[in-house]
Amino acid sequence: MTSKHPLLNRNLVLLIICQGLFLTNNVTFIAINGLVGLSLAPVSWMATLPVMGYVVGGAFSTSIVAKSQNYFGRKISFQLGLLVAMLSALLCAYAAVSKNFWLLVMGTFIAGYYSANGQLYRFAAAELTDLKQRDKAVSWVLAGGILGAVIGPNLASWTRDLFDTAFLGAYLTLSIAGFIGIFVMQFIHFPQELKTQHSLSDGRPLSVILRQPVFVVAIIGAALGYGVMNLLMAATPLAMQICGLPFSDTALVLEWHVIGMFAPGFFTGSLIQRFGTLKIMGVGVLLNFICIAIALTGTNLHQFFIALFLLGVGWNFLFTGATSLAMTAYQPNERDKAQAAINFFVFGTMAFTSFGSGALVTSHGWSILNWGSLIPVAITGLALYWLAQQRKNSQAPT
């Protein structure tokens, strides 16, 4: 491993590319699955079930992926995920052509296996550099999502009318992206694979790991931070269509939202090292509050644009910070089960918010959705304050 700047690490650069391809898949799915679902669903409130299928599939896959990572190692497990990405994209394409709503939901559910793998890229990044650079490595790999920010929404927009079936071209292109990912992953060397693999029963029981205050707050920050972001992002294409805004505007808003999610990755790691994890996560909570306040002022393009951009930056600070917190709470031989637990809570929260976003925005409107988002944001802020007080009390002289 190297002590140089993370970007100069060849393995890390290749993993950043894979992260970009992963987010291209995610952003494209968010941009089109709700709209394709709306055109195929028996009733409008079911429009985001394909989006929900993606995250529920991820939740169901977390334990399978943990066992796969432990048995096969990082590289092969990640490549299996990319293979599933190819096949599931083709299944979604067939569902769109055959106008089969439930087949579309099944396709996105299967694609969740890829998502469960991709969510581990950030943890794998920490293994590709030394301990002092770990926060920066995680931050830089998350920054690779900028590739998805640029390609995803534009891919959806450019390929929307490429065939008679709307967005068929996007699904077919995602299958090609999966193949490219398999090829790139082949050239990444994961040092962890050289070590003796551990059983998932090694180390402390998961119940002990889960009871640590730092791990509890890491889960809350990651799960609720992702949940609020997903709640508002998944609803945005539907909300903008209901408000009469063209899809080109939706693509623009999503592009800059995802740029907001990942562009800070170039410096979030440095900010964490300088100011501390909890303070940066606290800024993320504040940005979420500001996002909601702006979203509640109206439904014009500039309000969607600014709110979603700030939502993205807030998510970055919360999610990067939560990842850094989590890595202080487990030992190397506890890695797979601890990471699987975090991702299970993340996917579970995303599943709930994916369904809730479609149901709320189509039945109660954009404003009610934003008012409801205040609750998890407030809970996250209180959790950060609680952990800060725990640390302050433990350092107090006795």
How would you name each of these model-derived features?
Residues 20, 101-116, 303-317:
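Hydrophobic core of transmembrane alpha-helices in multi-pass small-molecule transporters
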Residues 61-74, 264-277, 361:
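Helix-to-loop junctions at the C-terminal end of transmembrane segments
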Residues 105-144:
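Cytoplasmic helix-loop-helix junction between adjacent transmembrane helices
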Residues 330-366:
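A late C-terminal transmembrane helix in Major Facilitator Superfamily
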